[in-house]
Amino acid sequence: GVGHLTLIDPDHLVSANLGRHVLGADDLGLPKAEALQEQIRKDLPTTEVTAFATFSEVVMYKNPEVFDKADLVVVTTADWQSEVALWRAKSDGTSWGLLQAWSEPHTQVGHALLAPSGAFDARSLFTDNGEFKHKFTEWPEGGVVALPACGESFIPGGSLGMVNIASMVSQTALRVLSGNIDSPSWVSSINRPDDVVMLGGKYLG
């Protein structure tokens, strides 16, 4: 199994995260990385877990040994600046592999881009603001839903679709760590494409 995990996330858990995050209501307001560290320590006491409640690029600069010791870096935060920093480092050549994963709105589709050890760069697959150029679904307003009277917004997604995507990402990561994938790969999870239209979107395939 995985003997060591380093969790990096600057965000705190908010109510909009519930249902699509492994953390629950008891963790609301807590730093995600530190709360998840505690949960993993309780559930898997044999796994060593380190947490940084900051951005990955900060850890790369202040604690470079974290990345130097890593076998695989998995980024699922959908923070484009952090993703750019990781791909910039990857393009120069690294010993660690990079797995970038995310869900499209409503979690009917998820993607994972894998770059093994070496020099690779997937930034050309995205627009300047981080939108994937080969998305499978299209939504009004880019899938962003505004919350009334508070100036906030969110991208909707259900727990069932997220479970499928999380499983796909986990399986891909384990296959990399076990040596079963050693070339650049793009893996996608498609749940119920017929539901995309029902939810107000368009399935592009």
Which residues fall in each region the model found?
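Glycine-rich phosphate-binding loop and adjoining beta1-alpha1-beta2 segment
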Residues: 4, 8-48
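Alpha-helix initiation/capping motif
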Residues: 14, 24-25, 31, 55, ...
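Charge-rich, low-complexity amphipathic helices
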Residues: 19-20, 27-30, 35, 55-58, ...
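A structured beta-alpha segment of the ubiquitous adenosine-cofactor-binding alpha/beta core
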Residues: 37-71, 78-79
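Glycine-rich phosphate/adenylate-binding loop
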Residues: 68-72, 77-205
